[in-house]
């Protein structure tokens, strides 16, 4: 239980690294999520925290990518957009 609590805290307190792209940060966060299946954080909470901690440029890029406010979109749209950005960066 202690490890789950520790890993949940890592996920909850996740910060993108300076100069890290959206795709890199999302990939790193997804790795944390995968390693801690019992994190009990909703997808909305995960995205909300991640978005709030992105650089201004990266937040603007997400808003532009969805032709409006990223955070006003539904959760499936937001999750899928981040997945597409990550997948496209791997090509």
Q: Where in the sequence are the language-model features?
A:
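Acidic, serine/threonine/proline- and glycine-enriched intrinsically disordered segments
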Residues: 1-91
């Amino acid at each position: 239980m202690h490890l789950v609590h520790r890993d949940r805290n890592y996920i909850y307190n996740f910060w993108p690294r300076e100069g890290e792209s959206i795709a890199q940060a999302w990939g790193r966060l997804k790795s944390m999520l995968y390693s801690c299946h019992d994190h009990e954080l909703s997808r909305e909470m995960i995205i909300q925290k991640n978005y709030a901690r992105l650089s201004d440029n990266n937040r603007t890029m997400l808003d532009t990518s969805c032709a409006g406010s990223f955070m006003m979109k539904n959760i499936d749209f937001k999750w899928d957009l981040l997945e597409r950005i990550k997948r496209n960066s791997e090509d």
